[in-house]
């Protein structure tokens, strides 16, 4: 049995080391791009030796997946309190929280939008689409079974990616509140167009 060190159990120490690696990797991906992730680079940023990397991750791909999970968890913490619980139109409060999180946090925007769109994290793009679908879906529905919901989510995330990243690069001269309003309105319009469209076959 492994004895606690300074009152901290071995399991807690392992969890802490893993969290440090994930946070360090998230910050690197969010500032330099996911292509800058490497075992040595991440361990140096986390203040750990390489052997502790392999204690938590079998490969760099596993770490990349954990970075996306970390980013989605950070997003969920912002938006889940605004998830609608009853029927109605598009959830405006959820939309504003979702868009606002990406406008306020450039690292989060880069990881979830830029790096999953043609970047090193592109294999995880579908997870971002799933978040958008779930947030816009009426309570009790099965959005994953609705092809039009997925098509609409791709259009919404594509629009959000271009405008949000352009704003972070200083290419859009508008206030933060205006950008959030514009993006939320575009989400609603795309959702309305999807809902009004004729039935779409999944074949």
Where are these regions (language model features)?
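Short hydrophobic clusters on alpha-helical segments that form packing/core surfaces
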Residues: 17, 21-29, 71, 75, ...
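Hydrophobic alpha-helical connector segments
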Residues: 77-106
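Amphipathic alpha-helical segments used for helix-helix packing
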Residues: 99-123, 137, 165
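Helix-turn-helix
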Residues: 28-62, 66
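Short, amphipathic alpha-helix enriched in basic
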Residues: 8, 14-41
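C-terminal peripheral helix-coil segments that are non-catalytic and often amphipathic
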Residues: 1-5, 134, 138, 166-203
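Short, basic, alpha-helical segments at the C-terminal edge of helix-turn-helix-like DNA-binding modules
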Residues: 39, 67-76
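Amphipathic alpha-helical packing segments from all-alpha helical-bundle domains
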Residues: 118-162, 177-181, 185-188
């Amino acid at each position: 049995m492994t004895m606690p060190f300074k009152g901290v159990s071995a399991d807690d120490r392992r969890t802490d080391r893993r969290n440090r690696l994930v946070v360090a990797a998230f910050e690197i991906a969010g500032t330099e791009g996911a292509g800058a992730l490497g075992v040595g680079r991440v361990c140096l940023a986390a203040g750990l030796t390489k052997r502790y990397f392999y204690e938590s991750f079998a490969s760099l791909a596993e770490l990349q997946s954990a970075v996306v999970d970390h980013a989605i968890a950070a997003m969920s913490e912002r938006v889940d309190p605004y998830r609608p619980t009853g029927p109605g139109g598009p959830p405006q409060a959820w939309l504003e929280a979702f868009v606002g999180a990406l406008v306020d946090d450039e690292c989060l925007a880069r990881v979830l939008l830029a790096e999953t769109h043609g970047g090193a994290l592109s294999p995880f793009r579908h997870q971002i689409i799933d978040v958008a679908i779930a947030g816009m879906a009426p309570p009790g529905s099965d959005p994953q079974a609705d092809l039009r919901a997925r098509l609409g989510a791709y259009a919404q995330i594509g629009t959000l990616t271009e405008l949000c990243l352009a704003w972070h690069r200083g290419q859009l001269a508008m206030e933060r509140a205006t950008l959030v309003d514009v993006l939320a309105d575009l989400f609603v319009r795309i959702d309305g167009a999807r809902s009004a469209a004729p039935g779409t076959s999944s074949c």
